[in-house]
């Protein structure tokens, strides 16, 4: 059998979705969906996730310990713009700190800007289905 070797620049990593792991984002359509009785069989909620938003340093340390050099993460629009035109600068600064910690750990961030969840206010305006919403 011929020996196979990965390229030295191969990306080994982790991929996550913010709605599933971050916790604390109550301004998205998925949060509202989870609050509707009967939508989730056991009644659980995505609101807490696994608290990655607050425990990211521990998570990134574990990734590094496992030999990961890449992390595909998402940025939930609803966390950064919870109301139309109103940006949460504290959340933006926190996300910047997360990216800086990844850099410190020499883990390459691969950013997903749209991972299905949208702000509730956007959906109520008709979301992507209304031409006037798209600039």
Feature-to-residue mapping (PLM):
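N-terminal carbohydrate-binding accessory modules
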Residues: 1-68
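Substrate-binding cleft and catalytic face of glycoside hydrolase catalytic domains
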Residues: 22-25, 60-135
């Amino acid at each position: 059998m011929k020996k196979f070797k990965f390229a030295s620049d191969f990306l080994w990593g982790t991929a996550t979705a913010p709605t599933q792991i971050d916790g604390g984002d109550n301004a998205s359509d998925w949060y509202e969906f989870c609050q509707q009785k009967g939508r989730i069989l056991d009644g659980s909620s995505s609101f807490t996730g696994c608290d990655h938003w607050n425990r990211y340093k521990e998570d990134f340390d574990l990734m590094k310990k496992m030999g990961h050099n890449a992390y595909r993460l998402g940025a939930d629009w609803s966390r950064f713009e919870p109301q139309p035109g109103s940006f949460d600068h504290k959340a933006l600064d926190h996300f910047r700190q997360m990216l800086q910690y990844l850099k410190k750990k020499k883990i390459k961030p691969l950013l997903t800007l749209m991972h299905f969840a949208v702000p509730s206010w956007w959906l109520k305006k008709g979301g992507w289905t209304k031409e006037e919403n798209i600039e």
